[in-house]
């Protein structure tokens, strides 16, 4: 049994090589997997299931082919694609996950997260996150005309980029105390997340027992990241190359 976990592709029309690499990944690697977890920020922006451009349609169709072929698909919202809804999930053949979420990988129960909720030192972002995950706020946004939502998404991305250039690196990384607290709350020794774009395996001690935090990397032209779990083997973080094509 093979399980794959990926995040932070940030798919958009300006990076067609990454989109092509992802579509190839679905046909090549994921087709041989039993389960694929998409842990957020698969899309750079998502303004609602009622707006589908060519890129979005391509991805949905590829995911549907994968799910129809027998691979179980799970989708967790990120800080960029938090408006992905049930219509997307139904079209893609995926199941939407809560964040955080417990999952059994091999013989081990692990905690899955996108990772943005762990960055509690970034108080400005945490305020935005609380607002953006509010169902009432989301309903108000989804009620806006598509053109207005496109402009809002563009504005939010620019604001985020400008703000991040002025923040210290430590603020945008996870808060260790928050990591320990949520792992303790869910009774796990392994946490897998993305968001920070800092791929690594962090080994530490939690309440006297060995623990680990596996951080997925973001995809870039020609390079991707995954966590792969084969049968009962422990999760393995892996960087891989793909052919970048326009």
Swiss-Prot record:
Tell where it localizes.
Answer: Cell inner membrane
What Gene3D superfamilies has UniProt attached to this entry? 3.60.21.10
CDD domains cross-referenced by the UniProt entry: MPP_YbbF-LpxH
Which residues are listed for Mn(2+) 1 binding in this entry? 8, 10, 41, 197
One Pfam annotation, family name?
Answer: Metallophos
Keyword Lipid metabolism in annotation: yes
Q: For this protein, what is any one GO molecular function term?
A: manganese ion binding
- Where is Mn(2+) 2 bound in this sequence? 41, 79, 114, 195
Q: Which UniProt keywords apply?
A: Cell inner membrane, Cell membrane, Hydrolase, Lipid A biosynthesis, Lipid biosynthesis, Lipid metabolism, Manganese, Membrane, Metal-binding
Query: What GO cellular component entries does it have?
Result: cytoplasm; extrinsic component of plasma membrane
Record pathway: Glycolipid biosynthesis; lipid IV(A) biosynthesis; lipid IV(A) from (3R)-3-hydroxytetradecanoyl-[acyl-carrier-protein] and UDP-N-acetyl-alpha-D-glucosamine: step 4/6
Annotated binding of substrate, by residue: 79-80, 122, 160, 164, 167, 195
Reaction it catalyzes: UDP-2-N,3-O-bis[(3R)-3-hydroxytetradecanoyl]-alpha-D-glucosamine + H2O = 2-N,3-O-bis[(3R)-3-hydroxytetradecanoyl]-alpha-D-glucosaminyl 1-phosphate + UMP + 2 H(+)
The cofactor note reads: Binds 2 Mn(2+) ions per subunit in a binuclear metal center.
Work out whether the entry's keyword set contains RNA-binding.
no
Required co-factor(s) are: Mn(2+)
List GO BP terms, alphabetically. Answer: lipid A biosynthetic process
Enzyme Commission number, as recorded: 3.6.1.54
Q: What class of enzyme is it?
A: hydrolase
Q: How does it sit in the membrane?
A: Peripheral membrane protein
| Similarity annotation | Belongs to the LpxH family.
HAMAP family linked: LpxH
State the protein's purpose: Hydrolyzes the pyrophosphate bond of UDP-2,3-diacylglucosamine to yield 2,3-diacylglucosamine 1-phosphate (lipid X) and UMP by catalyzing the attack of water at the alpha-P atom. Involved in the biosynthesis of lipid A, a phosphorylated glycolipid that anchors the lipopolysaccharide to the outer membrane of the cell.
Q: Which PANTHER family does the record match to this protein?
A: UDP-2,3-DIACYLGLUCOSAMINE HYDROLASE, UDP-2,3-DIACYLGLUCOSAMINE HYDROLASE-RELATED
Query: What name goes with this protein?
Result: UDP-2,3-diacylglucosamine hydrolase
Q: Gene encoding this chain?
A: lpxH
């Amino acid at each position: 049994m093979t399980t794959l976990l990926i995040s932070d592709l940030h798919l958009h029309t300006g990076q067609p090589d990454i989109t092509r690499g992802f579509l190839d990944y679905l046909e090549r690697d994921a087709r041989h997997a039993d389960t694929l977890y998409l842990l957020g920020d698969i899309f750079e922006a998502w303004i609602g299931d009622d707006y589908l451009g060519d890129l979005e349609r391509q991805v949905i169709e590829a995911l549907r082919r994968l799910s129809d072929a027998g691979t179980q698909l799970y989708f967790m919202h990120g800080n960029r694609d938090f408006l992905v809804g049930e219509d997307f999930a139904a079209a893609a053949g995926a199941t939407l996950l809560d964040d955080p979420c417990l999952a059994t990988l091999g013989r081990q129960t692990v905690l899955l997260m996108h990772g943005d909720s762990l960055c509690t030192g970034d108080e400005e972002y945490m305020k935005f996150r609380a607002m953006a995950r509010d169902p009432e706020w989301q309903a108000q946004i989804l009620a806006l005309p598509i053109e207005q939502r496109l402009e809002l998404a563009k504005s939010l991305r620019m604001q985020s980029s400008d703000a991040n250039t002025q923040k210290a690196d430590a603020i945008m990384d996870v808060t260790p105390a928050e990591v320990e607290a949520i792992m303790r709350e869910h009774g796990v020794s392994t946490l897998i997340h993305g968001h920070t774009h800092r791929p690594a395996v962090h080994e530490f001690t939690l309440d006297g027992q060995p623990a680990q935090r596996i951080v997925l990397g973001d995809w870039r032209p020609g390079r991707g990241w995954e966590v792969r779990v084969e049968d009962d083997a422990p999760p393995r973080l892996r960087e891989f190359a793909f052919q970048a094509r326009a």
